[in-house]
Amino acid sequence: MRIVIVGAGKLGYSIAELLSQEEYDIVVIDKEEKQLGNIKENLDVLTIAANGSSPITMDNPDVQGADMLIAVTGSDEVNMVCCILAKKHG
């Protein structure tokens, strides 16, 4: 199962850590390279430095085939847009 997590802050990191231990295929998206660096160093997950609320990001082949999207950015509006885009992109 492929799970996309938008937001690489504390909550996104914790979710990615837990799910990667369960052998899920995890993709973490965040605009901030610094946030992604910590995840790259410590977890066996794919990271994408991009805007999670962009249709271009949702068209990425690593994102398109996802079974689930979890949006945990610091903005409710961004989280909602991410979820709407994910639903539209399948």
Range-by-range predicted roles:
Residues 1-90:
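Cytosolic regulatory regions of ion transport systems
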